[in-house]
Amino acid sequence: MKHYHKIAKRCVPLLMGLALAVSGCTKNFESINTDPYGLDELDLKGDFAMYGGPFNQMQLGIHLFTPDWQYQLQTNLNADIFSGYFMTPNPFNANVNNSNYAMVDGWNNYIWTLAFDNVMSPAQAVIDRAKAEGLPNFEAWAIVLKVLTMHRISDVYGPVVYTNYGKINTDGSVTYDSQQEAYAAFFADLDLALEKLKPFAEDATKPKAFTAFDLVYGGDYVKWVKFINSLRLRLAVRIAKADPGKAVAEANKALTNSFGLIEEHAADFIIDSRNISNPLNVISNIWGDIRMGAPVEAFLVGYNDPRLASYFQQGTDDAAPGAFKGIRNGIDMPDKDLYSGFSRIKDLGTKMPLLTAAEVWFLKAEAKLNGWTVPGVNSVQEAYERGIEESLGQWGVGGQFEAYRNSTAKPIPYVDPHNEDNNVAAGSAYLSAVSPKWNDAGSNAEKLEQIITQKWIALFPESVEAWTEFRRTGYPKLFPVVINNSAGVIPNGQFIRRINFPLIEKETNQAGYQGAVQKLGGNDNIGTRLWWDK
């Protein structure tokens, strides 16, 4: 049976016909890859289409823009829910599904397979061809997108196929990296990408070869280098407990690089499809399959947060007309109609933020809290408040920064107007007591809770990162599922730690799968903690 890791044996399904020139998956390469309208290989090289064509697919495949149903399985019915941002009103599979920890293997395969099909496979093809033809800028760009995608996959599953991608063992299997090995490779690849892009960023006369294909920065090399530094800082902070020495070293690389990081929201890493609606719009506002999560209501209504109306719409439920209402995860869901009147997402247009200035400042705040050297930052509070300021600016409500940073408001108790069993009362251990206003007298744990709570609000709607940070830190305080169908894997009152390895791996890469479970260091279930989850 063909396995999708076997890049040398399978064709890469690229979006654009020009991208066939990159994959080279056929014996009839010359004839198939000759444009019948007169664009030969020389033409394609001249405007970089031969190398740039696959990048649309890669960029749109990280947070999958189309088809919508694949995004629903890739992210919406897992990380979107586990992050606390969303909950479905639809009792899928007779209400025995991911939302209450009865994991649906048929859904969860897509997290893995879409990453390899849409990003890893075309990225490796571009890297190989760019290396062969002396185009280090395209090689670097593909490496960066590969790291951005695959760290997310590792953060969902743990061990991952990365350094051995395309390397087939004699028994037909492919070997996984442990998560520690994968992170070491991510950092090494960021080193390589930075080395290759630096000459282009330093020389303004270099042609901006990415311009026609770059859905984020329009081909600006300097901004891509800043993104590399910012991504490195994200990954460094991620491993602070698992490998403190490596974390400090990598953070120092990011924080001292002369090009700097993403520090203003005008430079946010936001993928703009330009003509494809963010699938969350369709899933929420057309299909009616997703609504606001209860923690969003508790925090953002409680804080009178100025971003709330940019994130969600007021509900239409008869029991709470005009209110911003969220659904608690893992509840009894007799039918789709009961909670359909709760808050839908506000239209996100064609954009998806994946790494923002706000996140960078919250990373700096945590680094400073850890006692790391953070150039240009005098205090944890300074970086924390700058994170809030950049997030408010990103969402067009920057004028309310002063009032918000001085707010002592608290999250509100959660009330389900349809079932009081789902309520979270005042004084509950699951209801946070932190305010936006910085508490410099608080303990380090309380300060970390403030940082990550505001970071969680600012990351919206990037649920993979939000869920990852919740698992790593325990913040913000979210509400556990009411109905727990994990068969004891997740103790009541606790939370999912990862997603099982995809069924396709058990079926087509059995030896690799067994090695991955060994490297995971625990059972292949949703209760096993990842390497960085200390």
What do the PLM-derived regions correspond to, one by one?
Residues 1, 25-26, 58, 147, ...:
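Terminal processing/anchoring signals of secreted or surface-associated proteins
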Residues 1-34:
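Bacterial Sec-dependent N-terminal signal peptides
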Residues 45-48, 88-145, 149-400, 440-449, ...:
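Structured, solvent-exposed acidic/aromatic patches
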Residues 65-103:
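TM-lumen/periplasm interface segments of multi-pass membrane proteins
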Residues 70-74, 312-314, 463-472:
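Short coil/turn segments at secondary-structure boundaries
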